[in-house]
């Protein structure tokens, strides 16, 4: 009737294994405690059999798990038992799930309750010491007996007489109380043993301490750093990373973002820029007989990969282990690129993943650091067992030999201390070198709170939610030690393991500095045999491409101009010579090819925009449809012989046909050679305020009010970095008043001030990634031979991990394929006119002097006309009342930031309301068409030449 007949507690001695630290944290039983106070397993199994022989049922919470474990142990020890023959009464069933009614079960059902949840449902209170074995048994017993009292079991289940429940209720008229078992505090007992062991280990460490001078003279550099490209996980910008390295006089630094290499090019570029400045300053200092100002920095490109069991298996969530890989040289970098690409294109499942087979395939010229607590060796020490951790270590050592290092960290955490002790033992046993790292996510310790806000933004959490695991908790770093520490701070942390500091320079010395910038590589373009030149095969020349380009250009010129005058010939020869000297004939051939094919597919192609309209070669190839000679457009704006840079042609297609042109390019060059370009969505000033406010639980109204104080397109960094005088020059009076309100808020000590000041740190953080609207990359071979790639949600194409600001410097050919709705409208209109009126219209030959069209512009009726349909432009059209095509061209050029202020003068001069003046009489030749106002870049260039 609910009475305790017998109760026994036993600790079992671990044999051939150790109890992982994470299991010890939950149950309080350490390996040392179990070895000291435990009994052999065989003895405990015999005692369990004695109890089972007296029992009618096996009762428990989720007891199937216990049956499997104990059944295996009986089998392993070759002991017979009644355990699996007895009927089971489980307190964790679909029936108790219906009682507790907790949402979140499979198939829309209620979830099975945990022991704590069931206890809370039955008694209105949680029970203390969950996961203490004695407390668990007592709570399970209480729940089981209460379920009997409430008649939640049938007489058939309990195998009792019909009057049993009446008698049980009489014996227990009130809810069941705890039976009063004595709880052994195993955590305290384990902690006491650990304290004794730690004192012994400290004595041993002091005895083995190496020469202090070796530690003092050792170079320390940070080999484990995350930048803002570890999206929403780090507040460190690339610029900050390099600046912090320089600030602490370190001679190298590594970039090891989570599973991607988005920041690699920016990183090398920033370091190169720093080194250039330092070199100049040091040379200047030496000339003056002064001490050099600083050290040059060696950039170490790395990546912290998620290495799982099978990166192709997407049937279950497997994040794998976090392992740091560093490139020793350019070939190692190329292998990182391959792995980072595979992680996204093949292995992405919740996170980008690779596996050990991928690592084996691309392991050449790679250095491996074993990683943080989520690294394979460390994680297995904590969660699985030291034997399995050793097996993992052996695999990595077999693969990478002396390029494999055990990474130890000191963030003032007990779990790290436990791991480090084992790692040191492994290092001695397997002759693997230790390296000391700090897992850096922010630059300064005071940035820890801002970083925590960033993690909350990532997970959509409030900062007030406690950090921990499970329902009602959120992710967060355990303390504020994850910052870019100085050499002195790191040496102090690792004074008991000085070799971990000394070994770092060995890693740095293994790395060769290399350049990522390169000349643009064009895909091979097939030309007719009669134009091929055998010498090109020997020296990689472009004689054949130049000859073929000249041929098709002059053929096109005959069709465009009929008679090729001396002026046309000179212009063509000048442009072709410039194209030959800059090495870009292939570029024009590639563009001409897909534009011609677009027209063959009945895709509308725009007449041309931007500087490409200044090329007569482009006009003769039908790349553009505007005659540069007619409009005095200069080729030098497009391709300057004195400044060699990649030509840039923006090509408009009707938005419905753009996809077909893309398909043609993919089919021609191969899907593995064509990619779109990634974009990084960053936290702008206003969004950083709103995100921070949400996390801090600042009311939405207040967050919106503060955000509106920031002038459009302004940055918090610039506002707070400017003095009063500079601010007056930056903003108009009404905006300046708002800015001053913002500054006053930041000076306060309330939640609003905290929001603004934290938002300043978060501003500029990468929040998400997207796809460039029109940029397309074409490479000579597999794109992963050049840059890392990823995949995008709405596209089957690869996406470069490098963004638009660096793809060209990285040697990639970039084309802009613009989908223009206006072209689709024109195309549809032509079809409608044909269908309704049987009139054939050719948009390429519409007259540009049609009076009725000008009347539409004069009335401002320009809806649907590309770049003329905004309300502001419509107003100016009404005032201008254009009469010639030059008026429309000029207004298009003027209607943008900067030149806008000249629009009133332009309109007044056209109508004779303002006198047209020229600073010099010679200027009239070039400025007459724009009423004496310099509107176009061509005008500036022509005037400077004159």
Give, region by region, the residue ranges found by the protein language model.
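CheY-like receiver
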Residues: 44-47, 51, 244
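Alpha-helical scaffold/interaction cores of sigma-54-like transcription cofactors
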Residues: 192-946
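Metal-dependent phosphoesterase signature
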Residues: 26-45
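Conserved beta-strand scaffold positions in the cores of enzyme catalytic domains, especially
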Residues: 4-9, 34, 88-89, 220, ...
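Short His-Asn-centered micro-motif
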Residues: 37-38, 60-62, 371
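Metal-dependent phosphoesterase core characteristic of DEDDh/y 3'-5' exonuclease domains
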Residues: 1-31, 49-172
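Extreme N-terminal flexible tails
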Residues: 146-150, 157, 171-212
């Amino acid at each position: 009737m609910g009475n305790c007949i017998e109760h026994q507690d036993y600790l079992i001695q671990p044999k051939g294994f150790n109890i992982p630290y994470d299991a010890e944290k939950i149950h309080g039983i350490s390996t040392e405690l179990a070895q000291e106070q435990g009994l052999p397993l065989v003895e405990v199994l015999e005692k369990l059999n004695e109890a089972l022989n007296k029992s009618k049922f096996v009762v428990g919470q989720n007891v199937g798990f216990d049956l499997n474990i104990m059944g295996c142990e009986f089998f392993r020890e070759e002991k017979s038992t009644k355990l699996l023959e007895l009927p089971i009464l489980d307190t964790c069933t679909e029936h108790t799930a219906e009682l507790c009614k907790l949402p979140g079960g499979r198939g829309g059902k209620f979830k099975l309750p945990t022991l704590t949840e069931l206890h809370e449902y039955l008694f209105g209170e949680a029970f203390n010491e969950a996961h203490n074995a004695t407390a668990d048994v007592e709570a399970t017993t209480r729940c089981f007996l209460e379920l009997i009292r409430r008649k939640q079991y049938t007489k058939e289940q309990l195998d009792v007489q019909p009057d049993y429940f009446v008698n049980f209720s009489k014996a227990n008229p009130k809810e069941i109380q705890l039976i009063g078992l004595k709880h052994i505090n195993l955590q305290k007992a384990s902690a006491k043993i650990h304290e004794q062991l730690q004192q012994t280990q400290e004595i041993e460490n002091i005895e083995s301490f190496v020469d202090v001078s070796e530690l003092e003279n050792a170079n320390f550099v940070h080999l484990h750093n995350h930048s803002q490209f570890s999206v929403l996980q780090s507040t460190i910008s690339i610029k900050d990373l390099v600046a912090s390295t320089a600030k602490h006089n370190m001679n190298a630094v590594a970039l090891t973002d989570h599973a991607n290499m988005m920041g690699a090019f920016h990183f090398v570029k920033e370091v190169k820029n720093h080194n250039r400045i330092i070199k100049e300053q040091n040379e200047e200092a030496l000339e003056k007989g002064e001490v050099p100002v600083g050290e040059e920095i060696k950039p170490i490109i790395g990546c912290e990969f998620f290495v799982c069991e099978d990166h192709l298996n997407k049937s279950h969530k497997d994040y794998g282990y976090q392992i740091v890989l560093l490139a020793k040289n350019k070939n190692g970098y190329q292998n990182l690129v391959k792995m980072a690409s595979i992680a996204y294109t093949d292995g992405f499942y919740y996170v980008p993943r690779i596996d050990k087979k991928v690592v084996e395939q691309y392991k050449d010229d790679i250095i491996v650091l074993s990683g943080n607590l989520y690294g394979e060796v460390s994680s297995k020490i904590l969660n699985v067992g030291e034997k399995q951790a050793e097996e993992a270590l052996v695999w990595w050592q077999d693969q990478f030999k002396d390029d494999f290092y055990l990474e130890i960290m000191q963030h003032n955490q007990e779990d790290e201390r436990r791991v480090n002790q084992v790692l040191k033992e492994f290092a001695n046993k397997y002759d693997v070198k230790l390296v000391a790292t700090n897992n850096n996510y922010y630059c300064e310790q005071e940035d820890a709170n801002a970083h925590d806000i960033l993690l909350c933004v990532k997970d959509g959490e409030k900062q007030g939610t406690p950090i921990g695991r499970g329902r009602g908790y959120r992710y967060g770093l355990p303390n504020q030690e994850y910052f870019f520490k100085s050499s002195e701070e790191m040496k102090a942390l690792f004074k008991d393991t000085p070799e971990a500091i000394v070994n770092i320079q060995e890693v740095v010395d293994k790395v060769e500095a290399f350049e990522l910038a390169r000349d643009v590589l064009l895909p091979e373009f097939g030309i007719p045999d009669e134009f091929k030149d055998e010498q090109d095969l020997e020296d990689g020349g472009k004689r054949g491409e130049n000859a073929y380009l000249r041929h098709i250009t002059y053929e096109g010129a005959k069709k465009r101009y009929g008679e090729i005058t001396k002026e046309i010939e000179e212009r063509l020869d000048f442009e072709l010579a410039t194209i030959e000297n800059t090495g870009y004939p292939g570029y024009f051939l590639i563009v001409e090819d897909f534009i011609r094919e677009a027209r063959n597919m009945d895709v509308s192609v725009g007449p041309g925009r931007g500087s490409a309209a200044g090329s007569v070669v482009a006009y003769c190839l039908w790349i553009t449809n505007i005659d540069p000679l007619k409009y005095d457009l200069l080729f030098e704006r497009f391709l300057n012989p004195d400044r060699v840079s990649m030509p840039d042609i923006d090509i408009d297609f009707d938005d419905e046909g753009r996809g077909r042109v893309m398909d043609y390019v993919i089919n021609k060059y191969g899907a593995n050679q064509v990619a779109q370009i990634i974009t990084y969505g960053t936290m702008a000033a206003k969004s950083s305020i709103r995100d921070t406010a949400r996390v801090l639980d600042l009311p939405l109204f207040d967050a919106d009010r503060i955000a509106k104080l920031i002038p459009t397109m302004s940055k918090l960094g610039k506002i707070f970095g400017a003095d009063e005088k500079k601010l007056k020059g930056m903003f108009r009076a009404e905006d300046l008043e708002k800015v001053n309100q913002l500054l006053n808020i930041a000076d306060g000590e309330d939640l609003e001030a905290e929001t603004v000041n934290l938002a300043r740190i978060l501003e500029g953080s990468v929040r998400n990634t997207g796809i460039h609207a029109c940029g397309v990359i074409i490479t000579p071979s597999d794109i992963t031979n050049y840059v890392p790639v990823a995949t995008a949600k709405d596209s089957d194409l690869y996406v470069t991990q490098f963004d638009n600001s660096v793809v060209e410097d990285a040697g990639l050919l970039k084309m802009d394929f613009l989908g223009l709705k206006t072209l689709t409208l024109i195309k549809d209109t032509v079809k409608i006119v044909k269908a309704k009126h049987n009139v054939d219209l050719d948009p390429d030959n519409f007259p540009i002097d049609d009076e009725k069209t000008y009347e539409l512009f004069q009335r401002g009726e320009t809806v649907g006309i590309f770049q003329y349909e905004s309300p502001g432009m419509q107003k100016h059209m009404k005032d201008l009342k254009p009469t010639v095509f030059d008026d429309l061209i000029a207004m298009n050029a003027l209607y943008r930031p900067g030149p806008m202020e000249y629009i009133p003068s332009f309109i007044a001069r056209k109508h004779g309301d303002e006198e047209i003046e020229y600073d010099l009489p010679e200027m009239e030749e070039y400025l007459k068409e724009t009423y004496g106002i310099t509107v176009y870049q061509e005008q500036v260039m022509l005037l400077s030449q004159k």
